[in-house]
Each structure stands twice: as structure tokens, then as C-alpha cells.
Design a protein with these regions (language model features):
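Rossmann-like AdoMet/SAM-dependent catalytic core
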Residues: 24, 219-295
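A short SAM/SAH-binding and catalytic strip from SAM-dependent methyltransferases
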Residues: 173-188
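Conserved beta-strand signature within the Rossmann-like core of class I S-adenosyl-L-methionine
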Residues: 200-214
Length: 295
């Protein structure tokens, strides 16, 4: 039971938003993933659920995602999901049978999961999960038996307690997807979360994205950051946590992780956009990076 009791005092904030309010950022991400399915060929991520989940009424928003300025965000949302799912597939091949999606939002993996033995835990705020249930029902998308929802009461339970109560086997490794969450956290919440994951058995891993400190960015990157920062702050979900790659690795190693992969824009383009006839690729003016850490 040490996995539960150590470091329990810090509640986990999956997103910085008002209690009882579904995430507007989660909707924007879902619209961009859906737009990728409708617009880009070949697709970076095959997601037949994305368009039907958000339902009708967002056609104009999907059209905006075609604009040059919005294109990079559209592509990045699909790349980061593909990256995490590629790392998940690697862990499944090594025997991992538990997948925890932290801040799941409108993520669709659980409804197109190709791994019969993989159990999926979706963790998010109660309001966001209720909204997702409504969208799934409206779209006629059944919830598979191997999917468990964890509506985390941030004021009363730790992540570890909630996962154990939901049936996570802490004696076995797990893979964690943590996309679009870290930049919204406090440092204390980030450390508490990676400490919880870091106490799981060897073979456990987590994939996530993070943002660079604004003061370290070039003028062009700072302009991109400022635009994004103002937009999410206006939605009530301000960016507040940043790392240099070196500082991030120190945090992860201190939490018990033995290996860290840093996956920058150049890696993303070489891996997911190589030899495309349409010339699509991510702009080099990105303000963050993808990462995976293994216990």
C-alpha cells in the first residue's frame, strides 16, 4: 500500500479550470483532431471516431482549422496523439495491459482500441466526463467493457487512491497518456503525479507534452506562445508550468524514472511527415516538445 500513501497530500489538478465546467480546450483539441480526419491525406492518425464524437454544428470550426495559421495546431494535435499511441503499442508488445489516460477530455482511443487485453482508464474532471458521456450517447458510440471512467474529486482523493479503487493493478506496469495537461499544472501537482507513476513497477511509462519557458524562446516562438497563452487564458485555462529539456529530465529522474525520450519538432517531422506529396509538416516555430519517460 506504499504506492497509495506516499505523497498523498497533494491533490492532482488535471486541468486548471472552474469546478463543474467542461473544458473548452478539450473541445478545441477534438475539433482539430476531427478536422485532420476530414482534410489531410494521408492521415497521421487514423481516428474514425473523431468526427462523429463531436457531432454536428462544428463545420465552421473545422473549416477554420484549414487556415494556414491553424494548420500547425491541427497537425500537432494529431501528431502528439499518434506519438503517444505509438509508445503505447511498444509497451503493449512488452506485456503492458493497463493504459491510464490522464485528462482524457474527448480522447477516442478507448473506442477504437485494437488491443483486446488492454484495459483503459479515463481520468478527468466529473463535468468533462459527464459531457463526454453525453456526446458518446448522442453519437451512438458504445462504451467497451474494458473501459473504466475515473471522475477524480480533486479535493478529497489522490490519483493513486482513485486508480486503485477503479481496479488498476499496482503490482503490474501501466502506460500513462498525459497529453495537453502538463502546461496547465502547478509544479507541485506535476511532481505529485510523476511521483505516483514513478512508484509503479519497471516497465511503466508515461508520454506527455510540455512547454518551454517563455523567456528562453526566440522572438518568433515567443509570438506563437503569446498568441496561444492569451487564447487559453481567456478560456479560463492559463498556461503556468514550463520546463527546459534539462530541467524536465532532472525532475523525472528524481521521481524514479530511469530513461527519458525527448521528441522535438525535427523528430516529429522526420517520423510522421517524411516524403509527403502535399509537403505538410510542422512549423519549426514550436514552443514545446513531446516526451516519454520509463520507470
Amino acid at each position: 500500500m506504499l504506492w497509495v500513501t506516499a505523497g498523498q497530500s497533494t491533490p492532482i489538478r488535471l486541468l486548471n479550470m472552474q469546478t463543474g465546467r467542461a473544458s473548452r480546450t478539450a473541445l478545441r483539441v477534438a475539433i482539430r483532431r476531427a478536422a485532420h480526419q476530414a482534410i489531410d491525406r494521408p492521415r497521421i492518425l487514423e481516428d474514425p471516431i473523431a468526427v462523429c464524437l463531436i457531432g454536428p454544428g462544428y463545420e465552421r470550426d473545422m473549416e477554420r482549422a484549414m487556415h494556414f495559421v491553424a494548420r500547425d495546431f491541427r497537425l500537432y494535435m494529431s501528431v502528439r496523439s499518434r506519438y503517444a499511441e505509438d509508445r503505447l503499442a511498444q509497451q503493449v508488445a512488452e506485456g503492458v495491459e493497463q493504459y491510464v489516460i490522464l485528462g482524457a477530455g474527448l480522447d477516442t482511443f478507448a473506442y477504437r482500441n485494437p488491443f483486446a487485453a488492454l484495459r483503459v482508464f479515463e481520468v478527468d474532471f466529473p463535468a468533462t466526463q459527464q459531457w463526454k458521456h453525453e456526446l458518446l450517447a448522442a453519437a451512438g458510440i458504445a462504451i467497451p467493457n474494458n473501459v473504466t471512467f475515473i471522475a477524480l474529486d480533486l479535493e478529497h482523493k489522490s490519483l493513486a487512491e482513485s486508480l486503485l479503487e477503479a481496479g488498476l493493478n499496482a503490482a503490474e506496469p501501466a502506460f500513462f497518456g498525459w497529453l495537453g495537461v502538463v502546461p496547465y499544472l502547478t509544479l507541485e501537482a506535476f511532481r505529485s503525479t510523476i511521483a505516483t507513476i514513478g512508484r509503479l513497477p519497471a516497465g511503466t511509462a508515461v508520454s506527455f507534452d510540455y512547454a518551454f519557458p517563455p523567456e528562453t524562446l526566440s522572438a518568433k516562438r515567443r509570438q506563437v506562445f503569446d498568441t496561444l497563452s492569451k487564447r487559453v487564458a481567456a478560456a479560463g485555462e492559463p498556461l503556468q508550468l514550463f520546463f527546459t529539456p534539462e530541467d524536465l529530465e532532472k525532475e523525472l529522474h528524481a521521481a524514479g524514472f530511469s530513461r527519458v525520450e525527448q521528441f522535438d519538432t525535427d523528430c516529429m517531422n522526420k517520423t510522421y511527415f517524411k516524403d509527403r506529396a502535399d509537403g505538410l509538416k510542422l512549423s519549426p516555430v514550436r514552443v514545446g516538445m513531446l516526451a516519454t519517460a520509463w520507470v
